[in-house]
Amino acid sequence: MISKFKFSPAVKYSSDILTIIKNFNTSGQLFGNGDRNVIKLFDIEGSKINIKAFKIPNLINKVAYRYFRKSKARRSFEYATILLEKGIGTPQPIAFLEHFNIVGLRDSYYVSEHLVTDLTYRELVEIPDYPDHDKILRQFTRFSFELHQKGIEFLDHSPGNTLIKKKEDGNYEFFLVDLNRMEFHETMTFEMRMKNLCRLTPLKEMVAVMSNEYAKLYTESEEKTFETLWKYTADFQEKFYRKKRLKKKLKFWKH
């Protein structure tokens, strides 16, 4: 078996992390439901770290990740480094590790600091009277605008992938997680920007607030911003529920 790994330059406890990953299945505190990827928390040198073990890839991807594409763990590490260089919040990247066997990629891990935050965007969708709801939503929209201005297309810009933390001055800061699908551009068109926001909420009133705030920062009118964002949102919701119904039917026919 071949192992490849890389640590952030500031990390002083690299051998401890390699030992933790070696014993990953039998140690650590499970974080989340572990449906697709398994995330565990570990205490090390007085800090809490977060290790994500990516789902073992199928045969085609095993080969692809060895010869043609970077693994999700490596992309997460590299994209986190780029985000921080561009002044965008994300938990501090610590390391990635890949194990390869004769076929291809066997398994891979991404290690980062574990951030304790107050909420994710999902709470804004599910709890309409969440304290500071309007303020957080507007500040989140400004954060998304900053991403777009810097040419960052976060392809998994969905409700659970932005952590939100209240600062001492009463404002909010935002941190992106689940980073392995990202593209970087010189500039982003209006259509690209709106499409990038369409997976966040199905609620028309939230889309209206976001459109109002985004239009203050961009060259398009509020009316055009809302019209375009709502169109992409409705399209996404329709596809999402169509796929859900299809899965339900397939499940029914299997039984």
Predicted features by range, described:
Residues 1-29, 247:
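Juxta-kinase regulatory segment immediately upstream of eukaryotic protein kinase catalytic domains
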Residues 19-119, 149-150, 249:
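Conserved ATP-binding subdomain of kinase catalytic cores across diverse folds
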Residues 39-42, 50, 142-183:
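Active-site acidic catalytic loop and adjacent metal/ATP-binding pocket
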Residues 60-66, 122-126, 186-191:
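Short acidic, glycine/proline-rich loop/turn micro-motifs
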Residues 73, 82-89, 122-155, 159:
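Conserved kinase catalytic-core helix
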Residues 139-164, 205, 216, 222-228, ...:
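Charged, low-complexity C-terminal accessory regions
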Residues 171-253:
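C-lobe/activation-segment region of protein kinase-like
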